[in-house]
């Protein structure tokens, strides 16, 4: 198939590899984006993780928690400019959207938009959005929301950088006091700062681990020095790298950012607080929203540059 400039641009943003390397990878894999990423990784030309995409959209993330702290929601609402994102009217509106979403029965944005606007039942959520677009003077979009409930504990939230990042953490616990709440808040801050992909290793798909091992083996075999090592040593290298990656992408395995010794894991920190409060505690899940993740603004000049180099 024909390899287009936009395909090269997308692969470059996902991997950080050079444009011509991206074109070569796409050509070799007949335009299959996922296979092209693996191709570059095997050649040592891309990072270990796909990048979700440049953070380019404006807006804010907001959270809302029920009075009993057992139900919470995180929402993202986008606008065109950072100037409007800081506008008081816009921020008040986003808080109202979050307050509506924490009580919604809708399972997706389409259903949510069709609901009656709680503060004015004469209009729907969608109609209220249209009204706000007229008032604000910019296009706006309620992009997504996620709800978390915990009947046997609490849900806590954390907002970072004025709404750039929002996190919910589901904590199952038989003791709810200030110490447990502070621990949960610290875990939410951890998730905001270090961007884990999973709560625990148990959530990581076995096929993902298997594919990572294949890629690591290919990298080693492509290295003249490393490939000469005994198989037992190579297996140890692969398992060591996998373990290191899991410690980076799994929240409970990460090094706790406030650890006094610089070594304590999040899991160990939670266990410590639980013991100090004679409580049974389990961090069951987290949800992390970052404003604009996976979205980007148009960059016609860059696309033209890619096209020019491809046709050279």
What are the roles of these predicted feature ranges?
Residues 2-312:
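N-terminal assembly/interaction segments in proteins that build large macromolecular machines
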């Amino acid at each position: 198939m024909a390899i287009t400039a936009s395909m090269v641009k997308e692969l470059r943003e996902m991997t950080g590899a050079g444009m011509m390397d991206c074109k070569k990878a796409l050509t070799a894999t007949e335009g299959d984006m996922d296979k092209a990423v693996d191709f570059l990784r095997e050649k040592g030309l891309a990072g270990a993780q796909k990048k979700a995409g440049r953070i380019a959209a404006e807006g804010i993330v907001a959270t809302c928690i029920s009075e009993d702290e057992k139900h919470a929601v995180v929402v993202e609402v986008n606008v065109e400019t950072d100037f409007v994102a800081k506008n008081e009217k816009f921020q008040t509106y986003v808080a109202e959207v979050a307050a509506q979403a924490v009580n919604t029965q809708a399972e997706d944005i389409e259903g949510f938009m069709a609901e009656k606007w709680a503060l004015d039942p004469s209009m729907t959520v969608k109609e209220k959005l249209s009204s706000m677009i007229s008032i604000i003077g910019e296009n706006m979009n309620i992009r997504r929301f996620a709800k978390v409930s915990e009947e046997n504990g609490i849900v806590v939230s954390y907002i970072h950088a004025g709404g750039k990042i929002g996190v919910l953490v589901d904590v199952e616990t038989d003791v709810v006091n200030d110490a447990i709440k502070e621990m949960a808040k610290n875990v939410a801050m951890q998730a905001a700062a270090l961007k884990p992909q999973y709560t625990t290793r148990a959530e990581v798909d076995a096929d993902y681990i298997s594919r990572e091992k294949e890629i690591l083996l290919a990298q080693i075999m492509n290295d003249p020095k490393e490939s000469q090592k005994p198989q037992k040593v190579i297996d140890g290298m692969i398992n060591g790298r996998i373990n290191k990656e899991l410690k980076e992408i799994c929240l409970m395995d990460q090094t706790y950012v406030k650890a006094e010794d610089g070594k304590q894991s999040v899991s160990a920190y939670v266990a410590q607080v639980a013991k100090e409060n004679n409580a049974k505690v389990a961090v069951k899940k987290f949800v992390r929203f970052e404003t604009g993740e996976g979205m980007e603004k148009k960059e016609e000049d860059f696309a033209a540059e890619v096209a020019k180099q491809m046709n050279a």
